[in-house]
Every structure is written in structure tokens, then in C-alpha cells.
Amino acid sequence: MECRTVPFTALEITSADVADAIGYGPHLPDENVLQLISGLLCTFENIQTHYCLDIFDGMVHSKSIEINGVTFNSGTAVANVMQGAKQFAVFVATAGEEYERLCAELTSNKDADILSQYIADAIGSTIAVKLGAYVEKRLADAIIPQRFSHHLSPGYCHWPVSDQRPLFDLLGGNPCGVRLSDGFLMYPVKSLSGIIGDQVRQEVSGCDICPMVRCFRRHASTKLPNKT
């Protein structure tokens, strides 16, 4: 299993990325908001983020995915995306405890306004998204040098969130310090789990198979260059 620390700066998060997470989409906010975002990004610039990743053999069935002998009840939509995969990267990534601590300090500061707190939360969401992309790039560069899917996670498109537990168990139970609640929510909150299949027939993101077409956080696929 590969467990790594990733400096915040390596994620190359921009003010535009955070504005997108807030809901501005392709439009930028006014200069005052951009300055606030920029200042808060500096608050988090020294934190360390983390991921753990392992590769397992597996197979895809019509409504489920089997990884290292463990069956995930992914449902038809996710299984269809992963058709053709014989190996799976399973990962958990997190913004980490340092991020949570700084957010708590911001919330407890009586001078902090609600917008600043909202932006700080959006920065955490952006960290999680960027870590997912970082893991995919790591796979592309060094581990699985061929075509593979984007990451998909329990909770996507009728895949029961309870499958978080067996996913975490594949990575030792509490990978990179992330733990699950009884309701299968992750803590630290700004964390991401997922699977990535090799040799898939199509490359889509979770948003591509989600029926919530009017979600303000919806994104189109961002494909990595295929390697053959």
C-alpha cells in the first residue's frame, strides 16, 4: 500500500477553483470576493494533505464489482462504467487534521464573517477534488501506465454508502487517519474515497452518471491523456 503526504501547494489550487466550488461556475466573483479567497488560500498554504492507495485484482459483474474477493454492491450504472476492468486502485484521501483545526479556529473567531467560513469550507471541498485528480495523475505517471477510469465512490448513483466500510477495510481500516462514523461518513470531513478501474471502455466522472443535472456542483468529465 502506498501512503503519501501531499503539500497543499502541490495541489495548485487557484482562486478560480474555489470560486467554482462556491457555485460561480465559469464566472468569477467580484474583486472583493477574489481577494478574500486569495487571503484564505494563504491561510492553508502550509498544511499537509494525505492519501493511501493500493492495487487489487478484481472483476465486474452486471450489478456489482468484486475487488480482492470483496463484493461491492455498486449497482448497474457504476458497474457499466467499470466493465472491462481487471485491476482496481482503491484509495482514500483527506485534507487532514490541520485543515480541520484551521477551520475550527476560523469559526471560533468572533470577527470572522459567514462568507469567510463558507469559502474555507469550499477550499476543503476543492482540496478533496484536487486530491482525487492527484491520485489519478499518480496512477497515470507511475503505477498503471494505461487507460483507466476516473474515480467513483460509494454514494454515487445508487451505490450504497455502506460500502465505505469494506472499501476502508481493504486499506487497513483507517487509512491516512480517516475514520468512518456509524453512518459511514468520513472524518476529517473533507475526505474522499474511491475506486479506479483499469482498461475500461469509457471514461466518465461521478457527475456524468448522476441524475442531478441541475446540481450547482456538477462538472463535466475532465479526461486525463490515455496511455497505450
Q: What name fits each language-model region?
A:
Residues 24, 74, 106, 110, ...:
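A near-ubiquitous, low-amplitude feature marking generic local secondary-structure context
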